[in-house]
Structure formats: structure tokens, C-alpha cells
Amino acid sequence: MNKVLLAIAAFALVAAAVPSYAQQATTKDQLIGSWKVLSLKATTGDRVSYPLGEQVSGYVTITPTRFWLLFVDATRKAPAAPALTDAEAVAMMRTQVAWTGKYTTAEQTAEGIKLTARVDAASSQAIFDTDRVYFIRFDGNKMMVKSPSVIVPMTGATSIVEFELVKAD
């Protein structure tokens, strides 16, 4: 009887030590590629907002050394004329964000692999020459990205930013 209990306990320990598919560590190689954004939200305290609206459109492309991001509000209207009015230009800046920078990856945490990108070109000077830190993990075919706290260029607020992506064709 004791041997059976010992065998069951040993099996349970081994089974618990083997990570499931969903818990496997994220690797840098998994990040490489172009990803289509599915959602983007920002949380400040207990307030959740959608800085580019609830119908965001855009892509993130990750190469072995560089991170590119371009998001726009999918519901924004085209300007009436090729030359933007001042009001249209201001509105356009509030409905998009784009930046790029070299990045490094660090340790795997419970939240995912840590990625730190140094912004060297951006649509907003508020984020130029800053570090953007994200934790990235996978849930099936989706890449989930979450920041501990970054400046949201469209609002200027410091928020926890989360976006969900799927591999682009």
C-alpha cells in the first residue's frame, strides 16, 4: 500500500513539474514575423480606455533586432481634401501611433518573455528616446502583449497597455 502511495506521489510530482503547452516559455524566435492587431486597451488605475477606439487596425513587425508598430483607429474618416486642415491634422495625430526601435529580450517571467525596445523614431515626441517594456506570451495562435506602465502617445497618460495580435499572412 505504501509503495502504491509513493508511486502515485512520485507521478504527481513529475506531472506537476512538466509544463503544459500553454505554460511553455516564450522564445525570441516565436516573436519574429508580422502580427495583425486584434485589440488595444489602456488601463489607468481602475479606468479602462481604448485610445484608438474599439476598432483598432494595424500591425507589429518584429525582426531579430527591430520592433515596428503602427496602429490606427479603423473608423477614422478620410480627409475632405489632400491638404489637411489644422483640425484634421490634430485629429489624425490622435487616431494613430507608430514607432520603431531596437529591442532586447530578457528573462521569462510568469507574465511572459520581457522585451525592452529603445524608441529611435516615433510619431509622437512623447515616446521618442524612451524604453518601452512589454511582457509577451502566447495563447494558441495569439500573441498577448502587456506593458507594466508606458506613456500612451494619443493621450499622454501613463497606463498599462495591452494588445492582442495574430500572425499576419
Residue map of PLM features:
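Positively charged n-region of N-terminal signal peptides that target proteins for export
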Residues: 1-4
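Bacterial N-terminal signal peptides
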Residues: 7-16
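Lipid interaction determinants
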Residues: 20-169
